[in-house]
Regions:
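Envelope-exposed proteins and targeting segments
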Residues: 7-9, 110-112, 155, 247, ...
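Charged- and aromatic-enriched interaction segments used to assemble
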Residues: 8, 14-148
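Acidic, small/polar-enriched beta strand-loop surface segments
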Residues: 88, 118-208, 220-249, 255-261, ...
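Short amphipathic beta-strand and strand-loop transition segments with alternating hydrophobic
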Residues: 1-3, 103-105, 252-256
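Active-site nucleophile-His-acid catalytic modules used for acyl/amide transfer and hydrolysis
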Residues: 70-75, 207-222
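Membrane-proximal bilayer-interacting regions
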Residues: 252-255, 267-270, 282-286
């Protein structure tokens, strides 16, 4: 009920990406993990294919979903997982890889298309494309909120593989030194060899990076048009001269709000701030493994 006594209907829901939330990553019969090696795009699409498009159990298949052609974007990498939520895992891989992903509607073929998104570099530091700058000076953002956190920051990890006590295999990732060196122990006991141990260690060390988050309400019809000049996954320049903040950040989250009084956008630039739910999920993943 609104302040003037009128009834209001509030509708909230996920985009088509919510389909991936309905599936876990189930290893093949006789396998402890679903292992994926290749480009980071290939890895993301393998997990999606194995659990939505062509799963072993036909009851898990979602016939409406297809996967776009693999362009093998991203670096060569290796990931393994078991019984983790599909959407959470491919989001983790995508964030580590500086990629994105989406599921869009193909109206001509009545299909939902899963694809990886690379995003465009629209910062002021490049000259190939017209730059996109979000700033109060451009009158295209308001209600801004900036957080820079080093509370959980670590840059050197001692990664523990298989074995116990002095027989346990330990490898280091990260090369910082002196006062700037922040160390952490990383449990990688699932790794089968040194190569996988280091790869897994680098993935987990990324959880301890510096958090730079800029949240703002974006004016959708300002100097830069949403969906035309910029979109989710693009890297843009965010600036607030009063705060002395200038960031080249990826647009990691967009919330579209449709109300009686118009259309609004809320955007997150940079790393999301970990919530208590995120931390609980990480503990739960350790239990599953």
């Amino acid at each position: 009920m609104s302040e003037d006594g009128k009834e209001q209907l509030v509708i909230k829901g996920p985009t088509l990406k919510g389909i991936a939330k309905r599936r876990l990553i189930i290893p093949s019969i006789g396998q402890g993990y679903d292992n994926a090696i290749g480009s980071q795009e290939t890895i993301i699409k393998q997990f999606t294919n194995n659990n939505i498009v062509n799963p072993v159990d036909v009851n898990r298949k979602i016939p409406q979903v297809i996967i776009a052609k693999d362009k093998q974007r991203g670096k060569q990498d290796a990931w393994r997982t078991r019984y983790e939520n599909l959407a959470d895992k491919i989001t983790e891989i995508a964030e580590y890889s500086n990629l994105g992903w989406d599921i869009t509607l193909d109206t001509n073929n009545n299909k939902f298309v899963f694809d990886v998104i690379e995003g465009k570099n629209l910062t002021v530091d490049q000259e190939l494309l017209p730059p996109v700058i979000f700033s109060v000076d451009f009158d295209n953002i308001k209600n801004k909120h900036f957080v820079k956190s080093l509370l959980n920051y670590k840059n050197v990890g001692y990664c523990g593989g298989k074995g116990e006590d002095e027989e346990r295999l330990i490898q280091q990732v990260g090369e910082a030194k002196g006062l700037s060196r922040n160390e952490v122990f990383i449990d990688c006991s699932q790794a089968d060899d040194i190569s996988e141990l280091k790869s897994m260690g680098n993935h987990k060390l990324d959880d301890f990076k510096i958090v730079n988050t800029f949240e703002a309400q974006v004016i959708p019809y300002g100097a830069f048009i949403y969906g035309q000049d910029w979109d989710l996954g693009d890297i843009v320049t965010v600036q607030d001269k009063k705060w002395g903040v200038t960031l080249n950040s990826r647009i990691t989250e967009i919330k579209e709000i449709y109300e009686v009084n118009g259309f609004n956008l809320e955007c997150v630039f940079g790393n999301s701030i970990p919530t208590i739910i995120d931390k609980i999920k990480k503990v739960s993943k350790k239990d599953v493994r």
